[in-house]
UniProtKB/Swiss-Prot annotation:
Binding site for shikimate: 15-17, 62, 87, 102
Active site: residue positions: 66
Function as written in the Swiss-Prot or TrEMBL entry: Involved in the biosynthesis of the chorismate, which leads to the biosynthesis of aromatic amino acids. Catalyzes the reversible NADPH linked reduction of 3-dehydroshikimate (DHSA) to yield shikimate (SA).
Keywords: Amino-acid biosynthesis, Aromatic amino acid biosynthesis, NADP, Oxidoreductase
HAMAP family, per database record: Shikimate_DH_AroE (MF_00222)
Protein name: Shikimate dehydrogenase (NADP(+))
Gene from which this protein is expressed: aroE
Oligomer and partners: Homodimer.
GO cellular component, one term: cytosol
Molecular function terms, GO-annotated: NADP binding; shikimate 3-dehydrogenase (NADP+) activity
Enzyme Commission code: 1.1.1.25
NCBIfam families: aroE (TIGR00507), PRK00258.3-3 (NF001319)
Species for this entry: Desulfitobacterium hafniense (strain Y51)
Amino acid sequence: MVKHFAVIGDPIAHSLSPLMHNAGYKALNLAADYQKFQVSPEDLQEAVFGLKALGFSGWNVTVPHKETILPFLDELTEEAVRAGAVNTVKVDKGRLIGHNTDGSGFVRSLQEHMELDECKQIVILGAGGAAKGIAMALAPFGAQLCLMNRTPERGAELVEKILEGGGQARQEPWGRGEWLAQADCVIQTTSIGLKKEEYPFSLAGIRPGTLVVDIIFNPWETPFLHSAKAMGCKTVNGIDMLLYQGVNAWEFWLEDKAPVESMRKALYQALAV
């Protein structure tokens, strides 16, 4: 019996998730497929119950539905509760289980480049949905999280949530260079750079060798990463975050190890890198 999976969002045409998951199914000769569906906000409830009625085993959820889908689910995992958002749904004996693999996917990708237990200070630029998932997943590792956001109120809300969960966090003014100089890792989570625009403040003072991450992966190297590389930093884009959130979703659905390298190869080929 073929298992059906999908991703829903608006827009969705750009999604690389079907390529990644279908390559994984092919690598393991699994009877499964993965599709993408454009679902507008007003059609979300109908789509959720439609996928369930059609016998889908699970689906991913992307912008703008990660929070608005919550009322239509029967249960949330601890990761989903902590993030306050869902990017993965599993149908289990007729119940819809909401899960979040964004944060764990980011952590898994970051661990390929640094020992998180040895990291003392991490600067996170932005305080939107992506920053929230990343910050809540990083907090248990014990690093001091320094948030910088253009809208201080939103940053303050995220700091409070981290502190309530037992993590260490504070907010600093957007673009304060001295905090960049103290960071072991800097994570750029905003949309700045999608159109190849320059970052609105300088990275002057950042230490050579600092790990600098931009969760954007197209363009492959944003102006932000280009500047960091020019200053001697180790740079990483968001492609492996996409990979590992997909890998973690796969393992949540199928309760088995995903073929990581086959899924990675499909992503890299799609982006011609």
